């Protein structure tokens, strides 16, 4: 079990390193003025080819844009859970460690998004309402892949009913697949921008899950030691 958890942490770090390398490659490999208004696009040959293959589908873009509210609502629900624990237990230190870590995890993802909004790597392949918008990493894809796995993870931890857990698992898989594929074929992002979101969000989630499980293990070990001391 310990070996599996260690490999999970390593996988998370590797994915974050891959995201950093991917970002550098996009800035320096096959850069062409292939975007709207002549904006520079990295790995342009592949990006332009895939964009022409899928075309632009604004209906899919609009649907996935509105469905982006779902993970936001889920974040708010976890926030309410943490606040309820804080009010009831009257100390931040008594809030469940996995919820505190979840809040920190969401903050890190938000900061990453804001950073790339301020320092654009790629712009969208189309203008939105006549304006250029940053596209890397895809914000909606990042939001979905950051939040939805945590819904399944928290459900597995907190819900005893296996039917409800299974229903949540199916919902998470179907919703996530629809959103990622939808953004991919909608034509509002370059394919490299979707790939960047997948790598970043996956790496962050694996590290979050490792840390949450590690806190649980330490807590269990501490309780066992205290119990042995009492005996």
Predicted features along the sequence, with ranges:
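Membrane-embedded catalytic cores of phosphoryl/pyrophosphoryl-handling enzymes
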Residues: 2-10, 25, 128-231
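Hydrophobic alpha-helical bundle signature of multipass membrane enzymes
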Residues: 2-135, 141-168
